[in-house]
């Protein structure tokens, strides 16, 4: 997506938490190319530590991780009063409703290139993605 469509927020800090280091590096490279400052954590514990000690504007969180899942990490962040919007990454599997109540947006990993920047921009400006309307 060209920068003119989704302008970067040069002061925004994005925390990416994923146990897959290759995914983290892709996220870092992609987001830094658009002017974001990126913090990465390859474990839930490190992610929670960074979220509690650094000023973070948006969190990108993988759902499936070995020691804690995305729901547990999001719950802990909310318990710690972490106010940064949370974007949950999934591989398309069903995500339990309680998890959806803890996060601000969800993006499928196979759609990162097209959906991640607009989602970050919206959350950074507005704080939460509006719920989908199923009315015809």
Language model feature labels by segment:
Residues 1-13, 112-136:
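Non-catalytic signal-transmission and effector/linker regions of two-component phosphorelay proteins
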Residues 10-22, 27-31, 59:
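Conserved acidic segment of CheY-like receiver
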Residues 40-49, 70:
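Helix N-cap/capping motif at the beta->alpha junctions
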Residues 49, 71-82:
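Short amphipathic alpha-helix used as the core "switch/output" element in two-component signaling
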Residues 55-57, 81-85:
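His-Asp phosphorelay/catalytic-motif detector in bacterial-type signaling
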Residues 62:
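Active-site residues of response regulator receiver
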Residues 65:
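Receiver (REC) domain active-site loop signature in two-component systems and cognate sites
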Residues 89-90:
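Hydrophobic/aromatic residues positioned on beta-strands within the core alpha/beta folds
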């Amino acid at each position: 997506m060209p920068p003119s469509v989704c302008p970067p927020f040069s002061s925004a800090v994005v925390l990416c938490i994923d146990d897959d280091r290759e995914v983290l590096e892709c996220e870092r490279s992609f987001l830094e190319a658009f002017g974001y400052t990126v913090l990465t954590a390859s474990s839930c514990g490190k992610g929670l530590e960074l979220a509690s000690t650094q000023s973070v504007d948006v969190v990108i969180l993988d759902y499936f991780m070995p020691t804690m899942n995305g729901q547990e990490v999001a719950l802990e962040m909310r318990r710690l009063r972490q106010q940064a919007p949370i974007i949950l990454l999934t591989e398309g599997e069903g995500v339990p409703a309680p998890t959806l109540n803890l996060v601000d947006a969800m993006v499928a990993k196979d759609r990162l290139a097209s959906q991640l920047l607009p989602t970050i921009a919206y959350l950074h400006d507005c704080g939460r993605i509006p719920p989908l309307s199923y009315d015809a």
